[in-house]
């Protein structure tokens, strides 16, 4: 184990330890399946899978005679046929059978029939937070989406309020500020006037609507109050004579007041616009928008003053013509329909999140109602109008209080909900159709919808992704990723700048640095180090509580909503040992504003300086000295580092390396404390201290050179010896890219920042041959090749070494069964598995039968269908797997056997490989110099790597220089350092270490040229830098083609390495050749070397025969163009110089020959 020296400005020990870094996956799945509760026989909570079954059952038949009730579900662990390792080997899924106990109750007789019904299989999560589906490890990425609830926002001149449910119709209100009208939209259909909508929902008179939204005041009518009343609006109807009614919402004129006085009206109710805030708990409004809507109604229905209220029929017709245009309606049905859209639990569900958001917004205590209520609608309209009047503020859509996270458990719950609603439909049909009394519970339940939905989700959903397994950090980051894309999320094309941008609420919740470059920037992000997801799906981050200016050790997790308007101090504010701030003014932030405050006004304090960034970014030392763009590249490139054969932990680390290795799941940790009984390269056996018997031992199986998803090698190496005492959770075996239990993605190299003969121009890298010789950057890559042995119409295919027309030399690498021997070195074109397929046999002559019986298969008509090593691949065969029906029970239809061959290749560092540091400083190896030619220090030590100093100033990633300086001191002092982000070692501290190591405090030294032995003119910055080899290897990119496949229609060569394609000669290349007047070169490039079919064959013949050649026919693309024109109805033919027609198709050729 490495002892690290803490070189930070803060304390070495953290206030709060980091949570388990993959708990977002583990906790979410546990909440969904509740496996712990199932194992311990505890009652299940109403969440996840349990809530799905409770929602669907009980089911009752339409006649009410039969009910199907749910009791419980359980997982059959005995049904797990394979271990995780076997699943990967055999291409199977790691899953268990799910069963539910149902009671079929006959309500007329009281009889109950009980049965455990099979509900398909359910994939189980491994303890690393992954799933194994069809032999490949997959991760379900958490989705960040718009939270259900209500949002208020503005676009152009329109003010909007939108109520978004978890499931159901969207309700949207909008105010057109030019016209002062308020409209409502249901499911983004046409607009309806809000007063009509309110009438349809039960506020059917003007009086009721006014009473709901406005404060009303009474006023006496007399000559003194005339002036005050004139121009005001009535709040209640006033009837003077039988045919003369003044309606609520009408404007009062002097003439009206005269009428009131004449007819003995002493007191009237007026709308009090100014008293909107005078009643606590009531959201009254001061706007006349609703009154304008009354006027609009009058105009729409041509109502005259003194006319009565709108009839129920005309309201429902107006509303319904928008909801279901062109449908005949009955008024009662229409009214019921409208109410069920929002008020029925079957069709509408706010979700507990939506209800929480609504209640929080409007200050209500209700947290249980899952449907909308009239109060919600009224509150929403009032709030929107108050915003319009400037009494309230708009919401920020990108605030993390309005976005929430859906992890595995919730995504699966939704899949099961959808599937179970289909199951319910089928079951109800069967209940009403069949002979009821002969029914059994299992006959009612159709399991197909469930099985197919789960299968589809894991295999094809945008959120179920092939795990990024290049190295442990890539795995870990993939599990902690938040994706805004996917079903129910955003789409790349429609996502604007605002959604992608960093928001102040991301602090401590989402990393502002780590996100992909390119079209997904800002849509795919990473969880911050301390961040957790709460029960509502909102991201929370921990803070220390500050009471009366004193910092306590109480930790409180706050969501973005709770954090609003709180005053929060930074983690590195100076605090005395008793918890008091040492400064009179402390730097704080309040809702995105940065300012200073007196200690007594502070509410909370950050837990750690690294709480605002992600795990990848927290691995970059001196992060605060880098430009953010380069830090982003650094974070992303660490995930692409290939696991090396001999990695070293970084001399300059950040303290996160150990935590990442431990939580990524690639190392092996001791489950219980004890003593090592056996430690071999295959397994470790530990006898626990609290063993219950002699046989109670902990066995750990080690992975040896297993292939990962990205073809890198997964290999464990033992860290313990026989007889060693180990503690609980101690690391007993290293995994890929870990060393001594720490993440080790690369190696420490002696670097000089110096240009060298132009070989490190433009980010190119010059390295020493020592690095290649000592295998510092050698990695192992394992490829899998598979072949299926099928049953064909003409008989089965065979795996055999008896292959027709193949020389004995080629077959020498196969064993007697036709399978390549393990340990063989194979090259492109070699046969890995000999396979023959029967050809169709015509009538066999007696002579042929005789030959067959003498010579066996060779003479028989079979086709060679062997598996060969593809181009560009070579290496050693390390394993061969044969999977038959007996092994796995089910192979795809028509397949008898699957054979897999694994080929491993040791790849040394070579020119063209991409390397990078941790600060976004990437480059391609341009030259590998002999050690004696490398520049060397005064004591004769040659450099390992030369980087161009011009790569630093414009990129502004100074972190690499500070890392190099401290690394140099560490190398010569034999120390390893922890330099936590945002509280790194100071310049003085680094200079002190350099002096101690005997270097100049600037770490500049005189370098000598390896060619001439002369010193360079100026001193050169020398240091030790941590460099990684990235997954972009030149061997995977190099590609050449002589002859290969052609596209079917255009007959031009395919493109790309995967298709063994050619190099496209595009229009610009054609222009270049035209500019040179290279007519013959151009002609052959555009015809015989591309798509002139007859010319291709002829030229090949001529080359073989050695005849000088000058062939050219008609390129196929010309024929394609001709046929397209003919398809448009042009009758076209082509003729040569002599006037003879040239045929374009075989049919044409026949016709011409006839004539």
Curated annotation (Swiss-Prot):
GO-annotated biological processes: DNA-templated transcription
Any one GO molecular-function label of the UniProt entry: DNA-directed RNA polymerase activity
Enzyme class: transferase
Disulfide bonds: none
Family: Belongs to the RNA polymerase beta chain family.
Function summary: DNA-dependent RNA polymerase catalyzes the transcription of DNA into RNA using the four ribonucleoside triphosphates as substrates.
The protein's name in its UniProt record: DNA-directed RNA polymerase subunit beta
Organism: Borrelia recurrentis (strain A1)
